[in-house]
UniProtKB/Swiss-Prot annotation:
This is Queuine tRNA-ribosyltransferase. The gene is tgt. The lineage of its organism: Bacteria, Bacillati, Chloroflexota, Dehalococcoidia, Dehalococcoidales. It comes from Dehalococcoides mccartyi (strain ATCC BAA-2266 / KCTC 15142 / 195). Keywords: Glycosyltransferase, Metal-binding, Queuosine biosynthesis, Transferase, tRNA processing, Zinc. Belongs to the queuine tRNA-ribosyltransferase family. It comes from the Bacteria. Residues 247-253, 271-275 are annotated as: RNA binding.
Amino acid sequence: MDKSFILNKTSPRSSARRGQLLTAHGQVETPVFCPVGSQATVKTLTPEDLKSVNVNMILSNTYHLYLRPGIPVVKEMGGLHKFMNWDGVILTDSGGYQIFSLANLRKLDEGGVSFRSHIDGSTRYITPEDAVSFQQDLGSDIAMVLDECPHSEASENEVLAAMERTHQWAKRCLAAHTLKSQHLFAIVQGGLSPVLRQQSAEYLASLDFPGYALGGLSLGEPKDITFETVRHTLRFLPENKPRYLMGVGAPEDLLEGVSCGVDIFDCVLPTRVARNGAFFSRLGRLNIRNASFATQKGPVDPECNCYTCRNYSAAYLHHLFRCEEILAYRLATIHNIAFLSNLMQEVRTSIEKDCFEEFKGDFLTRYQPTNESVRIEQKQKWLSARSGETSS
């Protein structure tokens, strides 16, 4: 496909954008949040569950599928869409971030990256050309280049080297990409340096990719730094191409990202916290394990109309989590994905009506975000845990 994006409107008082992402499996209204299905499934949900909450785009991960069941198996099954019985849009990550997360288990050179599988310890080597070939065999609608994501404490020289390697790999990925029905997105790196972020954005923009992602952010740095970097970087990317902020999914962060001019988001957060008993609501996250929910007859979120809130009391959900029943994780996940899907629909409508800033302000007046210092500590612990495994 030649055209990847239609920009319909930009807010007159911010950089919020309303558009459509054009793919071989349909049109996606933007701004959009994509649930993550790393291993060809959004954990605990069926494709029908996703459609019921108006999700038509998900992310899957090439790294996981490469290791298990293997790219040839998925290709033999007719590609990723048929393999998982999903007729919506699929974005595949190249696996660069997952390999980065392996820390001591991987080694980089100019040709590619070698790493030890977190499953069986076997040594693998992936080149940029391999990453493209794998994603073409998967048949995703949007593929990502292989990039190097420097760790959050990397030196300036290390960040520069990672950026330059990412640029060279991006050129190789672009040269190797031949599947016309698939869009290949570049990934901007550069750490938290405004100078390097500008250099990366300008260089990748000169290569004329169908879309651009911002990588290497939301890795434990303060949120104000994250979005300062996002705003700065987007100034140097083309307005007529989609912008994708990787790894961001908290409600307050989605609103801030939209106000910066981001079109696409993904994150494991809503599904991961759901399995830990955290339910999104207009007031903030609610911990269903708290004793206050043990006898609550009404739904956990009275303002929500999802399947979970229509059919089950907070007391029942509290009981399921206390007993560690599998149904608990499924019902919580349905709710959190529905919450974000509805939130993004409201965002799109508010941009159309020129009242996004009021909507954002009203939402954040009521919503209580997670404590920032606690959030950073939790993020660092999660990243450390991922050094030896990559499950989402």
